[in-house]
Amino acid sequence: MAAAVEALYVVLEREGAILPRQEGFSGVYVFFSPINFVIPPMGAVMLSLRLRVCIPPGYFGRFLALTDVNQPDVFTESYIMTPDMTEELSVVLFNHGDQFFYGHAGMAVVRLMLIRVVFPVVRQASNV
């Protein structure tokens, strides 16, 4: 019996959505902005990526800040993604600097890290 192929399935929902790129052979995927955007100084923007992902069973995902944006003051906020989530993905980007940040369509904006999890059974013990 052949082993099941694990894959991160991506549904491009709307115009401008860009397929993420895997970093090497890691469990990290780079996502790109579908539009031009501006983050004001000390401000934030909620950026829709215009896509959905299907996290493989046995994993959970988390967005990470993208350090190679070359803008040291721009950070991201995220939540844990599980295989049962189906909503379109958005990312909140914060600009903690004193200059406007100008992003463009096709620019890398966030990383998704997939983390393998195990589901051990619960057993009662008299001593640990």
Swiss-Prot record:
- Which Pfam family would be a valid example here? dUTPase
Gene3D superfamilies recorded: 2.70.40.10
What highest taxon heads this organism's lineage? Viruses
* Residue intervals annotated with topology Cytoplasmic: 1-26, 121-128
* Annotated TM spans: 27-47, 100-120
Which keywords, in A-to-Z order, does the entry hold? Early protein, Host membrane, Host-virus interaction, Membrane, Transmembrane, Transmembrane helix
- Subcellular localization(s) per the UniProt record: Host membrane
Q: Which GO terms describe its cellular component?
A: host cell membrane; membrane
Q: How does it sit in the membrane?
A: Multi-pass membrane protein
Q: Where do we find the motif PBZ domain binding motif here?
A: 125-128
Extracellular-side positions: 48-99
Subunit description: May interact with host PDZ proteins through the PDZ domain binding motif (PBM), namely host DLG1, PATJ and TJP2.
Entry function: May modulate tight-junctions functions of infected cells through interactions with PDZ proteins. E4 ORF1 has ben show for Adenovirus 9 to interact with protein involved in tight junction regulation. May play a role in mTOR activation by activating PI3-kinase, thus overriding cellular checkpoint for translation.
Protein name, please?
Early 4 ORF1 protein
The species is: Human adenovirus C serotype 2 (HAdV-2)
